[in-house]
Each structure stands twice: as C-alpha cells, then as structure tokens.
Amino acid sequence: MSFKLVSSPHRHCVFTIPQELRIFFRKDRNLLNCLFDAVRQTILYMFRKINKAENFTPGFVCVLHTFGRSLQWNPHIHVLISEGGAGNITPWRVVKHFNFNFLRNSFQMLLLKLLEQQIGPSFKKIKASIYKNQENGFYVYAKPNLTNNKSVLDYIGRYLGRPVIASSRIDKYDGNFVTFHYNRHEDEKLISETVSAWNFIKKLIIHIPEKHFKMIRYYGIYAKKHKNSHKLFPLIKKEKRRFLASLNAWKTSLFFSFGCDPIKCTCGHTMSVLEIFLKGSPLIHSIRKFTSSA
C-alpha cells in the first residue's frame, strides 16, 4: 500500500457516528458500504470546492474499524488524506486547511441520505431525531498531521493491520475468565474488565468481517492512475520498491523452505529494516541494516 502514496504531508482524520446509528450497521453489515461512500463523497467534495474547474483530487486511504477500546460494536473510519491534490491543469496544489465544520455537516448529511435510501421510509423518524440532537454534525476529528515519510509509513503499519485487541492488553486467563484492560476514551482512565471466556470470544467474533468485504479502500489519486500522477513524487522511490519487494520474497522463501525467519533475532525479537542504501543505476549495491525492535 505504501507504494501508492505520494511524498506529501498527510492528515489522519477519524469519522464517527452517534450511538443510535450503530445498531443499523450491526443488523445489516452491507450498510458499512454507506459509511465508506459518505466519507469518500465528503472528502472529494471538500477538495473540489477549492476550484471546480481544476477539480483537485487528493489521495486518501480509508480503514474501517468496527471496535471501540472496550471491544463494543462501534464502527468508524480512519482516513489518511494527502495535504494536497492533483488538478486537471495544476499538477499539485498544497491544501493545509481542512474545514471541519464542513466535514462534520457534510458527512452527516450524506450518510443519513444514503441510509434512508437503503433502509427506506422507516428511517425518516430516526433521521429527523438525529438532525435535532446532532445540530453540529457527526464528530470528525483530526490527529496531528504526518509531516514526513517515516510518520506516514509508521501510521500505515499501526492502523492497517490493527487487531481488535492487542495481546498486551490481555492481563490474565485462568481457563474460565479473561481479564483485559483499556483506557476509557472519555477521560483516558485505565479500566480493567473480567469476563467469561465465552463472552470474550463473543466480543471478538462480532468484528470478523463478511467474506470478501474490503476493510481498507483507496480513493482519489490512490484509487487509480491520475493523468498527472507521473508528475508527482512517490513516497517510496522505484529503486527502493524493487529492493523491498525482493526482500519480502527472500524472507518468505526462506521461511517456507527451511522453516526459519531470517530477521528473527536470537533474543526472540523481530528485527526491522532501518535504511536501504542504493548506489548507482541500476541497483548494484545495497546495505541492509537491521536492529532489534526490543
């Protein structure tokens, strides 16, 4: 996925929905497509408003998480958005200001409209109630922007493969009960919860996606080749792409052939690539530096 990205600061935004809507997505998981579509339309329209003739198009990646910190059903979408877009004429326009009032209200309007189209007239009463109780739109917030390539790649690794619960949050299992902890979202207070093993499993399996359902989706210039994409600078240069691909193939081949992981340290930790040094063209020399992630 990192091969798709352009070398630009990116913004991490999170699009959330009110609690009274969550049950609809739980009963009919096809509605999760509406969540993706509402986010897509909102972001593209925000950039299009800058200059309709140019129709600036950003690159963004949407990742659906259906879980909250306490493992409850809480569908929301994390988005990595380039701080800029490619235009019909201008190769790239930097966009630093994101109008969050627009994002909140537009996302609310589009999602409720899409849900009404899918659910039917019975949804109108819920829709009216939500507009009354959510006058400022749905909650959309942004974390600090990712200003360099390393920050963007760290984000990719952290959110794209994020499990429902990390093993480090499971404190105890005695054969019958599981104790896990989390920081409560409202005040970051540490909460410890003990549930039966069966209930713990139930909390986990509700987050298993339907077969063939895509939890990660690419939009804008990351979805397909834009006519000005050849003028943009990629996050990872082509020379490094080839080497990284061969490095991954090398690890996989050794593992399946000999059952060993070549980058697993004798201390038990997995080593990671720090840097790749390239010399000349084509690639004639490379140095692979590893360090323990401990």
Predicted regions and their residues:
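Beta->alpha loop/short-helix hinge microenvironment recognizer with preference
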Residues: M1-A294
